[in-house]
């Protein structure tokens, strides 16, 4: 404690400063183009992928990026196709955010964030045409493959959609389906015990997110940065660097120059 002109001044360690006034702490860091995890304002976390990590799944992958850890296991089951799509299979993605990955998530029903991300994953699979669903059909009107993609966050630190998608995409690339045929005499599917085939992906799709804090764009925001931000923008590109999807949350409207900048950055990162 120091005394200046008879007035006592308090000094705090960075950790205490962060707890007392998190907004001012983040603003102080960003003015120096640095963040609490050491990245610059425009820097994305590097993703490390380990695939085929679950021996009992048809496909799997675990990704790590900073403090984030997401794992995806894909299980293939056979079901009767829907009446309105008799020659197609389908994919069911689901994200689990449990109290084990962050204290902000509570036991019980899925959190709002988990439900929103799961829905966005499902819509993205449809909009991107990543998988030809007809390739999942075994026999029209009788049998098709259903891919249940369970994505579990083991440790959470922001940008849930980006990393859930990264884990899902990495796992899809490893899927092996048993060679299956429809036996009309037995009226059931016969699967080969050893022969398998991959799921053909039409392109590669990547997701890039930003948040806005104090009029500053934060690439790949952490959990703490998301809590303090007012706007969020996600841009998804395919391997041709064409836009697959744009997700905007918070705020009023996207400034054209801001959107253009984010698109340019995303394309440079692909």
From Swiss-Prot:
Keywords, alphabetical: Cytoplasm, Exosome, Nucleus, RNA-binding, rRNA processing
Subcellular location: Cytoplasm; Nucleus, Nucleolus
One MF annotation (Gene Ontology) recorded for this entry: 3'-5'-RNA exonuclease activity
Primary location group: cytoplasm
Gene3D superfamilies in the record: GHMP Kinase, N-terminal domain
Function recorded in the entry: Non-catalytic component of the RNA exosome complex which has 3'->5' exoribonuclease activity and participates in a multitude of cellular RNA processing and degradation events. In the nucleus, the RNA exosome complex is involved in proper maturation of stable RNA species such as rRNA, snRNA and snoRNA, in the elimination of RNA processing by-products and non-coding 'pervasive' transcripts, such as antisense RNA species and cryptic unstable transcripts (CUTs), and of mRNAs with processing defects, thereby limiting or excluding their export to the cytoplasm.
Protein name: Exosome complex component rrp43
């Amino acid at each position: 404690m120091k005394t200046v002109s008879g007035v006592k001044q308090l000094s705090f360690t960075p950790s205490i400063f962060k707890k007392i006034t998190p907004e001012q702490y983040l603003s102080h860091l960003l003015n120096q183009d640095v963040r609490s995890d050491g990245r610059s304002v425009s820097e994305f976390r590097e993703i490390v992928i380990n695939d085929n990590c679950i021996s009992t799944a048809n496909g799997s992958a675990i990704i790590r990026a900073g403090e984030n850890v997401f794992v995806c296991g894909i299980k293939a089951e056979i079901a009767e196709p829907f009446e309105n799509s008799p020659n197609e299979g389908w994919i069911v993605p689901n994200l689990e955010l449990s109290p084990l990955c962050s204290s902000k998530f509570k036991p019980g029903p899925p959190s709002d964030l988990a439900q929103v991300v799961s829905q966005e994953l499902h819509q993205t699979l449809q909009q991107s045409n990543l998988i030809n669903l007809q390739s999942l059909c075994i026999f029209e009107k009788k049998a098709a493959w259903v891919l249940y993609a369970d994505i579990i966050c083991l440790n959470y630190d922001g940008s849930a959609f980006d990393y859930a998608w990264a884990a899902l995409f990495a796992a899809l690339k490893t899927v092996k389906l048993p060679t299956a045929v429809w036996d009309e005499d037995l009226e059931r599917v016969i699967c080969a015990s050893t022969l398998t085939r991959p799921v053909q992906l039409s392109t590669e799709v990547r997701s890039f997110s930003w948040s806005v804090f104090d009029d500053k764009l934060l690439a790949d925001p952490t959990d703490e940065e998301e809590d303090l931000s007012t706007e969020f923008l996600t841009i998804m590109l395919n391997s041709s660097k064409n836009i697959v999807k744009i997700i905007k949350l918070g705020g009023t409207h996207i400034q054209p120059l801001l959107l253009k900048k984010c698109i340019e950055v995303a394309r440079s990162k692909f």
